[in-house]
Every structure is written in structure tokens, then in C-alpha cells.
């Protein structure tokens, strides 16, 4: 096989395409090298192990799904934030089917911890963005939160329910948005924007 000079980004782009088409379990050093048209050693130059390749691929998929820095900049409503996250995942679901379940099912035991750490890092980033949107939302009732009903716990609750909707492949988060509205906004709060 001719050695082709490539980059880590090019390898990850091919690896993501393979994961989207065949699932994360299809990734291994040989299959990625073959798809890239390079020797297996070229892949090892960038990724010392299959676990590193898979973790980097998962991280790239997360980056593609949640372009958080761009999406959160102009969101000042918590419900808009939740809807934006839901829509972002739904749009990406067609490209990366079963992404949320592939971590548990498609990664070998030795690779699961690396994949889990990568996923947890992105999920924490999402939750922090949700908390910021909640704190900036001027429509939230002043008495909505207290010691017994804290913002952080509410974000965890909403995110957990979003996650459930993703795994169930639901097409709408309307009921969750209504629960949010009834919980933290004044009764006269407008319908979804």
C-alpha cells in the first residue's frame, strides 16, 4: 500500500463517516487505514490505540452534534435553549443513528471508560450552557427557585428528561417544555416561541 500523507483531522473525518454508516463497532485500526488509503502504521502515528481512535471519533461526533459555543451565544430563554438542544440532536440523529446507545453497546470494555469520559465532558458542557441560559432568562419567576428547588437540580432534571427523549427517539419535546413553563414561569408566560 502506498503511504499517503494525511492528517489527524482527515483520519477523524473518515472515522466519523464510518461510525455514521456502520456504527462505532466497525472502527478498528485496519478498517480506518484502509478507508484512508494509508498504512496501518500511519494511523498509529496519530492514535496510539484503538481506544484513542474511538474516543477521538466520539469527541468529533459530539462536536458536530453540539456546536455549543455558537448555539448558546444568543439564547436568553431557558425553553429556547432546551428546544435548541433537542432540535440539534434530532437533526444529527439522521447522520449518526443510535449515537446515544452506541457508547454502551458498541465499545469494548477497555474502550468504554475512555468513551464515557469523553461523553461526560460534553454532557457537562451542555448542562453548563443550560444553567447559563436559565440564569439569563428574565421571564423566570423570582420565587421559582429556593433551597429546596435549586437551579442546578432543575437543569439536571430537565437534561435527564431530554436524554430520555433522545434515547426513545421522540420527535417532540413539547411536554417537557410545558412542564418547564408551568414550573418556573408566571402563568401568563407566552406559548413557545
Task: For each feature predicted by the language model, list its residue ranges.
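Short helix-capping/turn signature of helix-turn-helix
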Residues: 47, 103-111
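Hydrophobic alpha-helical segments that form the core
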Residues: 127-135, 141-185, 193
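Amphipathic alpha-helical packing segments from all-alpha helical-bundle domains
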Residues: 92-98, 102, 112-140, 149-152
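Short, basic, alpha-helical segments at the C-terminal edge of helix-turn-helix-like DNA-binding modules
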Residues: 59-66
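Helical hydrophobic small-molecule/effector-binding pocket
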Residues: 79-105, 164-170, 189
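Helix-turn-helix
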Residues: 10, 14-52, 56
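Hydrophobic alpha-helical connector segments
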Residues: 56, 70-95, 151-155, 177
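Short, hydrophobic secondary-structure boundary micro-motifs
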Residues: 28, 98-103, 142-146, 192-193
Amino acid at each position: 500500500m502506498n503511504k499517503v500523507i494525511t492528517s489527524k483531522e482527515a483520519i477523524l473525518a473518515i472515522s466519523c463517516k464510518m461510525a455514521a454508516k456502520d456504527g462505532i463497532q466497525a472502527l478498528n485500526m485496519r478498517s480506518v487505514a484502509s478507508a484512508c488509503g494509508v498504512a496501518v502504521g500511519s494511523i498509529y502515528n496519530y492514535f496510539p490505540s484503538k481506544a484513542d481512535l474511538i474516543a477521538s471519533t466520539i469527541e468529533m461526533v459530539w462536536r458536530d452534534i453540539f456546536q455549543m459555543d455558537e448555539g448558546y451565544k444568543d439564547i436568553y430563554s431557558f425553553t429556547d435553549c432546551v428546544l435548541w438542544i433537542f432540535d440539534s440532536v434530532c437533526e444529527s440523529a439522521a447522520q449518526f443513528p443510535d449515537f446515544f446507545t452506541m457508547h454502551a453497546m458498541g465499545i469494548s470494555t477497555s474502550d468504554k471508560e475512555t468513551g464515557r469520559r469523553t461523553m461526560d465532558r460534553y454532557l457537562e458542557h451542555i448542562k453548563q450552557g443550560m444553567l447559563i441560559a436559565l440564569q439569563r432568562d428574565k421571564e423566570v419567576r423570582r420565587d421559582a427557585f429556593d433551597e429546596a428547588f435549586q437551579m442546578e437540580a432543575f437543569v439536571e432534571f430537565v437534561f435527564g428528561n431530554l436524554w430520555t427523549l433522545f434515547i426513545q427517539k421522540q420527535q417532540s419535546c413539547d411536554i417537557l417544555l410545558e412542564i418547564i413553563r408551568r414550573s418556573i414561569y408566571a402563568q401568563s408566560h407566552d406559548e413557545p416561541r
